[in-house]
């Protein structure tokens, strides 16, 4: 995180002195401001505080604590500047650069984490209105958000560009930096490292509701590898990698002996090859328009809007994958109150956005990590929360080495 911030600070410090076109200069500075805000946003989500470094520093610099509020204030300042100076879109040669919409989306999310829903709604509404112009919207095929077949589309608000060109050896080959490596770490043992697993409760949650056509939620098939998926999706391929010997229903056979084993399928490259490596070519979507729609629905009810109005935006996300509108679904009772709607919205976000990096921020924003009631709900689904300590584990510890090197300027997070 702080290496990225250091590089942003170099741009923000030295570019103003360069003789160049003024509009282009502002756009360069705005991109650096956006990226610095993105890094600090993540720091606040993970540690609840950090150290605020806004200029290039040398090895002798000793950082000091910055509070969560101080970091949010800097995130807001950087993103307001970015939103003012970034274009709505870029030409083909510059696809992937931060845009005004990306800045407003991240700013809206930052406000939401602080429960400033009025401000968040204002920022997110800009993107909602741009759907009318075609700048943003949901693409027809949900899975295209996780392959290289339809990148930088109208659903993508901000995505990191990756490619598999100039492939080199594994290890520390510099070419690895251009490829998306997550697929290698999450793929099942025997294909990848199997480092990231899903929990069975998420599979069961998907299976609670059928599509209008009677089939299961296609997001499940494309998000999680689990024992029995070929039975739940008989019309989809039983193979999830292009392996010649496909005698077994769920190839490959050695990817897990435990029937509870569930691996992350989202973003894998089984649609074009039989293995994973460090050079996947699919871009990583940081913010999608579907995420914005669900965030906007939350803002509506948190600012005294009606549940019926908010449900329209959730229904857009559900309709895309063939599910009934909320009022016609088994969850229709969620429309009876704000609390019931927000509880259902929590699960709608989980089913749409699992493994995309927003879950922890959601749990913190909803207060589920701060009460025994919230932890009990999480424990009922996920044994990882059995040892969760309220007041401690909502944040990570500050690395002790950094504290030791700070000459007393940095302090440890509570209870560590």
Give residue spans per PLM region.
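An aromatic- and glycine-enriched ligand-binding surface/loop that stacks and positions planar moieties
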Residues: 80-81, 97-248, 375
């Amino acid at each position: 995180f702080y290496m990225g911030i250091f590089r942003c600070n170099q741009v923000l410090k030295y570019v103003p002195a360069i003789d160049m076109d003024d509009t282009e200069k502002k756009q360069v500075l705005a991109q650096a401001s956006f990226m610095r805000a993105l890094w600090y946003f993540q720091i606040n989500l993970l540690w609840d505080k950090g150290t605020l470094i806004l200029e290039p520093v040398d090895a002798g610099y000793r950082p000091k604590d910055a509070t969560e509020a101080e970091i949010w204030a800097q995130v807001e300042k950087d993103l307001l500047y970015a939103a003012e100076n970034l274009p709505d879109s870029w030409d083909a040669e510059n696809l992937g650069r931060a845009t005004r919409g990306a800045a407003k989306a991240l700013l809206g999310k930052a406000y939401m984490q602080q429960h400033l829903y009025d401000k968040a709604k204002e920022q997110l509404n800009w993107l909602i209105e741009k759907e009318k112009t075609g700048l943003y919207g949901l693409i027809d095929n949900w899975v295209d958000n996780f392959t290289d077949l339809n990148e930088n589309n109208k659903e993508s608000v901000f995505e990191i560009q990756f490619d598999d060109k100039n492939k080199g050896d594994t290890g520390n080959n510099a070419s690895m930096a251009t490829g998306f490596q997550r697929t290698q770490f999450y793929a099942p043992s025997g294909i990848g490292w199997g480092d990231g697993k899903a929990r069975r409760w998420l599979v069961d949650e998907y299976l609670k509701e059928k599509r209008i056509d009677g089939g299961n939620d296609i997001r499940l098939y494309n998000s999680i590898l689990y024992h029995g998926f070929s039975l739940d999706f008989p019309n989809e391929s039983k193979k999830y990698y292009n392996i010649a010997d496909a005698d077994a229903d769920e190839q490959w056979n050695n990817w897990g002996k435990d029937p509870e084993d569930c691996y992350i399928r989202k973003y894998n490259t089984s649609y074009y090859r039989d293995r994973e490596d460090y050079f996947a070519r699919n871009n990583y979507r940081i913010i999608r328009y579907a995420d914005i729609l669900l965030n906007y629905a939350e803002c509506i009810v948190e600012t005294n809007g009606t549940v019926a109005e908010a449900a329209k935006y959730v229904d857009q996300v559900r309709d895309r994958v063939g599910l009934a509108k909320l009022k016609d679904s088994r969850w229709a009772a969620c429309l009876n109150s704000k609390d019931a709607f927000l509880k259902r919205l929590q699960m709608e976000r989980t089913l749409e956005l699992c493994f995309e990096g927003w879950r922890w921020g959601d749990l913190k924003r909803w207060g589920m990590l701060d009460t025994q009631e919230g932890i009990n709900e999480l424990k009922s689904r996920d044994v990882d929360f059995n040892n969760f300590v309220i007041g401690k584990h909502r944040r990570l510890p500050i690395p002790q080495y950094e504290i030791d090197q700070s000459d007393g300027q940095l302090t440890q997070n509570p209870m560590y």
